[in-house]
Amino acid sequence: MDIIETAKLEGHLESQTNNSTNTYTSPTEAVEEEDKNGKGKPKTLSNGLRKGAKKYPDYIQISMPNDSRNKLPLEWWKTGIAFVYALFNLILTTVMITVVHERVPPKELSPPLPDKFFDYVDRVKWAFSVSEINGMVLVGLWLTQWLFLRYKSIVGRRFFFIMGTLYLYRCITMYVTTLPVPGMHFQCAPKLNGDSQAKIQRILRLLSGGGLSITGSHILCGDFLFSGHTVVLTLTYLFIKEYSPRHFWWYHLVCWLLSAAGIICILVAHEHYTVDVIIAYYITTRLFWWYHSMANEKNLKVSSQTNFLSRAWWFPIFYFFEKNVQGSIPCCFSWPLSWPPGCFKSSCKKYSRVQKIGEDNEKST
């Protein structure tokens, strides 16, 4: 009797197993069955899993978070604000030069201050023209390079903010301390003695000529502390080197020679005191390096007791411009316009291969 009952129980279990097998076929059995028919392929396994999952959804779907946020948003409207900021300080500088010019003492009454560089190097008349030409060449190179940058909006707002801040500092220094002319060769324009209309004309003349001697617009005196020419020569070189490929060493060397020669020619021409050039170089390089260190380091973007850089007066402005920029800007170029054919477009060159693979994965998804 025990044998008969055991046989019945095994038959009952076998029938239940067959019924469940008829309703659901495991992927492994499907593969084995198709292997017998000579059609076993890796593709059948994935199909079996897919069909089984759809028919019997006894699983938990875990949705992975997709980081769809752009780590380098362009935000051109912020670039426009930075441009207005730089333009305002540039106009303010011309106004301040016009005001300070009225306070410059005559060179007959207040001779030039002693300067060690002038004691050892005689004045060369054409040297200042070389300095201004070098500055225009560097500005042209930087403008061309900036137009081909992929993230030109982020780089542009950095340039405009730093340039505007430097000229704001220059307005303050030249206003609080008026130095006598650095050489007896200076031919300053006559004082206007309160003629507002003539002062406005001088401001417009300075703006139209860029404040350059070779354009005939540099006729006012008093803007000696600190040198605006040194600011332009230094800042353009720093941006050219920072946002160009590292293996363009020859390009960096040429730009460095143009910048260094231009700064030396300012002193050789006796157009600025040596202290003017030193202060301009120091303030320009410090502000550039501080800003980019804070922009590239996430921890320095947060105001805290240990972050002493956040105590700068311009930190709120910096945070407004850089709060959505995650990480450093890759050296990536693109055609500035969308109309040229594809043969003229070059692929972006990045230093990080991992970043390139990440962007390819984002495009595929």
Curated annotation (Swiss-Prot):
GO biological process, one term: ceramide phosphoethanolamine biosynthetic process
Membrane topology per record: Multi-pass membrane protein
Start and end residues of each stretch annotated as Disordered: 9-50
Tissue note: Expression restricted to late round spermatids and elongating spermatids but not detected in late elongate spermatids and Sertoli cells (at protein level).
Superkingdom as given in the UniProt entry: Eukaryota
Compartment(s) of residence: Cell membrane; Golgi apparatus membrane
Swiss-Prot/TrEMBL catalytic activity: an N-acylsphing-4-enine + a 1,2-diacyl-sn-glycero-3-phosphocholine = a sphingomyelin + a 1,2-diacyl-sn-glycerol; an N-acylsphinganine + a 1,2-diacyl-sn-glycero-3-phosphocholine = an N-acylsphinganine-1-phosphocholine + a 1,2-diacyl-sn-glycerol; an N-acyl-(4R)-4-hydroxysphinganine + a 1,2-diacyl-sn-glycero-3-phosphocholine = an N-acyl-(4R)-4-hydroxysphinganine-phosphocholine + a 1,2-diacyl-sn-glycerol; an N-acylsphing-4-enine + a 1,2-diacyl-sn-glycero-3-phosphoethanolamine = an N-acylsphing-4-enine 1-phosphoethanolamine + a 1,2-diacyl-sn-glycerol
Biased composition range(s): Low complexity: 15-28
EC numbers on record: 2.7.8.27
Catalytic residues (positions): H229, H272, D276
Record-level Gene Ontology MF annotations: ceramide cholinephosphotransferase activity; ceramide phosphoethanolamine synthase activity; kinase activity; sphingomyelin synthase activity
Keywords: Cell membrane, Golgi apparatus, Kinase, Lipid metabolism, Lipoprotein, Membrane, Palmitate, Sphingolipid metabolism, Transferase, Transmembrane, Transmembrane helix
Lipid attachment site numbers (S-palmitoyl cysteine): C331, C332, C343, C348
Residues passing through the membrane, by range: 80-100, 128-148, 159-179, 219-239, 248-268, 273-290
Primary role: Sphingomyelin synthase that primarily contributes to sphingomyelin synthesis and homeostasis at the plasma membrane. Catalyzes the reversible transfer of phosphocholine moiety in sphingomyelin biosynthesis: in the forward reaction transfers phosphocholine head group of phosphatidylcholine (PC) on to ceramide (CER) to form ceramide phosphocholine (sphingomyelin, SM) and diacylglycerol (DAG) as by-product, and in the reverse reaction transfers phosphocholine from SM to DAG to form PC and CER. The direction of the reaction appears to depend on the levels of CER and DAG in the plasma membrane.
Protein's UniProt name: Phosphatidylcholine:ceramide cholinephosphotransferase 2
Protein species of origin: Rattus norvegicus
